[in-house]
A protein has these predicted regions:
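A short beta-loop-alpha structural element at the N-terminal edge
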Residues: 2-14, 137, 157-171, 313-327
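Acyl-donor (CoA/ACP) binding surface of acyl/acetyltransferases
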Residues: 14, 217, 226, 263, ...
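Conserved donor-binding loop and adjoining core beta-sheet/short helix segment
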Residues: 28-99, 212-241, 385-391
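Conserved acetyl-CoA pyrophosphate-binding loop and the N-cap/start of the following alpha-helix
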Residues: 74-78, 240-251, 404, 408-417
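Conserved GNAT acetyl-CoA-binding A-motif
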Residues: 89-99, 258-266, 424-433
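Conserved active-site alpha-helix within GNAT-family acetyltransferase domains
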Residues: 102-115, 269-286, 411, 436-453
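Acyltransferase donor/substrate-recognition loop-hinge adjacent to the catalytic core
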Residues: 111-182
Length: 465
């Protein structure tokens, strides 16, 4: 499994090389957003296959950003690694804030996936030249506001801000606080986070500036260049100085946007006033952020079906199977070939309901389906489909109670479920494995699957038709 580390101030310098060349144009693909909103996003990072992997946890739900490649990074391999990490953790892969440019690849990647693309998530993207010039009739309103500001504030100038300007910034935040009208906890928290971002100017990650007039700052902004996009994390100005906001937008874009094609002024946070303001600056595009929640073929089932063969019935486990199923699960001698020790996941005392409860919970979560193998109504074993790869393949296993071994029941049950999985459930592939020294299982699997490869421990099989 991947090892994730929480995003901290120190981590920003580690994330920055990936975001510095990132071409996704969305604000979430920046070190500043990951750090500024760390308590909301609960972001953690890992590196695999030459790509940065960000895992967030929102409202208790784990979700990933789209992989950000470094030099030579393999996004396809990174996606597969994340899928495998989710499989091992027993959670479904969810990729959020996926840029529209990459969405087509993901839409074709998984057989079952739910896609969401909401207006409220979209970033406001502007041509850098448009904001730096405000040229043409469509920007006449902004120019009028700026002309008024310049007339009322002769000598006002834009200055870059560095760590040496802490005194100026301290005075500005005091002035801004005196005018700040919003009383909601969220607004107050956002202001505190904005102030904190200016304490990290020594990292070299951010571009910051302000409008200085008569020795005091009237406006400040802080941004981060990611690929060809300047992502504006903070914009604050004193409302009492009419026209200061459009003046700041233009001056900041003119000073820092020369090496950028795009300026991202982030989303509107579902705020009517922010949406109105951002639209007035005439965005060239709204940067879509798409969410992909990956499903599996088991999602289509309302209940576990009943299958029949010449001698057997395969159906859901019932309470009447408790004793026989517990005996099957507790047979350590036989289960050494099963490849799984229940003690690994057991938390607390082992109860008589534990094993049946696990099968029911796994099906409820649609991560596995367990069939009881019945001979004349008696439970003599199980066949399980589990370990899905989210791309149309699942692993299958079978075990038969020792007193019923040697009669071909395992082969009969295994073949029936494999056929059902391919032609009724709709899987693309069923895979299985057995220990190299497990000759009976090798013979069973060879009779109904294709032997594909071996390693030092296992022999592997697959069934496509």
């Amino acid at each position: 499994m991947l090892n994730f580390t929480p995003v901290t101030a120190e981590a920003m310098t580690l994330l920055r090389p990936y975001y510095e060349t990132c071409t996704y144009r969305l604000c979430e693909y920046s070190a500043g957003v990951k750090y500024m909103w760390r308590d909301h996003l609960h972001s953690e990072y890992a590196v695999t296959d030459g790509c940065l992997i960000i895992r967030n946890r929102l409202d208790g739900v784990t979700q990933f950003d789209y992989p950000i490649p470094g030099p030579g990074g393999d996004v396809e391999a990174a996606l597969a690694t994340v899928e495998d990490d989710c499989r091992q953790r027993g959670v479904r892969p969810i990729f959020s804030v996926v840029p529209e440019s990459e969405a087509g690849k993901l839409a074709l990647r998984w057989p079952r996936v739910t896609i969401t693309n909401e207006r409220v998530w979209k970033d406001y993207l502007y041509h850098a030249e448009d904001l730096a010039r405000f040229a043409g009739r469509r920007y006449s309103g902004q120019r009028n506001h700026i002309n008024k500001f310049n007339k009322e504030h002769p000598g006002a100038e834009f200055i870059p801000l560095t760590v040496e300007d802490s005194a100026l910034l301290e005075t500005f935040w005091a002035d801004y606080g005196a005018e700040f009208q919003k009383q909601s906890p969220g607004a107050k928290r956002e202001l505190a986070l904005a102030q904190e971002m200016f304490t990290h100017l020594d990292t070299g990650i951010f571009r910051a500036g302000g409008i200085l007039w008569q020795g005091r700052l009237l406006a400040v902004a802080l941004a981060e260049k990611c690929g060809d996009t300047l992502v504006c994390h903070v914009e604050k100005a004193l409302y009492s100085h009419a026209g200061v906001y459009p003046a700041m937008v233009q001056l900041f874009a003119g000073y820092y946007g020369g090496d950028c094609r795009w300026i991202n002024r982030e989303d509107d946070g579902r705020d009517r006033g922010l949406r109105t303001s951002k639209l007035q600056y005439l965005p060239a595009e709204l940067g879509g952020k798409m969410r992909f929640e990956v499903g599996c073929e088991l999602d289509a089932l309302r209940h576990i079906p009943e299958l029949t063969t010449e001698r057997l019935t395969l159906s859901p486990f019932t309470d009447a199977d408790k004793a026989s199923y517990n005996a099957l699960c507790l047979d350590d001698q036989r289960n050494r070939w099963w490849g799984y020790d229940y003690r690994t996941d057991l938390k607390g005392p082992l109860t008589e309901d534990y094993f049946l409860d696990v099968t029911r919970q796994d099906f409820e979560n649609r991560i596995a389906i367990n069939f009881a193998v019945r001979l004349e109504g008696q439970c003599i074993g199980e066949v399980v489909l589990y370990n899905g790869d989210w791309r149309g393949s699942m692993e299958q296993g079978c075990r038969i109670a020792p007193e019923y071994a040697g009669h071909g029941y395992g082969t009969e049950a295994f073949a029936a479920v494999a056929d059902w999985a391919l032609y009724q459930l709709g899987l693309t592939r069923v895979v299985a494995k057995c220990y190299r020294e497990n000759t009976p299982s090798f013979k069973m699997l060879s009779s109904c699957m294709r032997h594909t490869r071996d390693d030092e421990t296992f022999q592997y099989f697959e069934k496509l038709v």
